[in-house]
């Protein structure tokens, strides 16, 4: 009887979206890497509301068809080839609001300014951030590149360009 009860509880938990279980929202997103001398922090709740870690692929046991972009990925386009090696690459760190601020998910991000294409890499089992990510959510598409969501590209690229301009004027001796 205990075994049946335990299996029922496990089945119920697997069918429940991770976002309902966690009741945690993205508290902060940090963009670092490439030529950024200091990380960019996104803390505006209205902006963060668009980029929830616990949304998209892997957040349901019975995966719905993903017809809309979410998190920072354009899911309907599916996986894509690795972007060109010469593109600037950034680490995007996601912090959740669970009793206290905690880093819970990291992805790689690259953007091709000429084509306007952005790319997101979900670390795979042999990658540095996989264990941390898998502790939060296993999307079952880890280790693959995806096209980034254009809404994410718009926010990220505006912030990156702004920071690069600040760095450029500071490096030339002009205060921003």
Task: Enumerate the predicted regions with their spans.
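Bacterial N-terminal signal peptides
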Residues: 8-16
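Function-determining sites in protein domains
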Residues: 21-176
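Bacterial N-terminal signal peptides that target proteins for export
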Residues: 1-8
């Amino acid at each position: 009887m205990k075994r049946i009860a335990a299996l029922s509880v496990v089945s119920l938990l697997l069918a429940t979206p991770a976002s309902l279980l966690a009741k945690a929202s993205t508290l902060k997103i940090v963009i670092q890497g490439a030529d950024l001398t200091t990380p960019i922090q996104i803390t505006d709740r209205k902006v963060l509301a668009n980029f929830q870690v616990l949304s998209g692929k892997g957040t349901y046991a019975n995966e719905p068809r993903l017809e809309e972009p979410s998190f920072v990925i354009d899911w309907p386009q599916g996986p894509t080839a690795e972007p060109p090696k010469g593109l600037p690459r950034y680490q995007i760190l996601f912090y959740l609001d669970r009793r206290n601020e905690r880093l819970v998910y990291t992805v790689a991000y690259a953007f091709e300014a000429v084509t306007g294409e952005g790319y997101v890499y979900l670390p795979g089992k042999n990658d540095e951030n996989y264990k941390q990510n898998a502790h939060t959510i296993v999307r079952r598409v880890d280790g693959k590149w995806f096209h980034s969501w254009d809404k994410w590209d718009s926010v990220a690229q505006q912030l990156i360009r702004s920071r690069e301009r600040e760095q450029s004027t500071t490096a030339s001796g002009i205060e921003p």
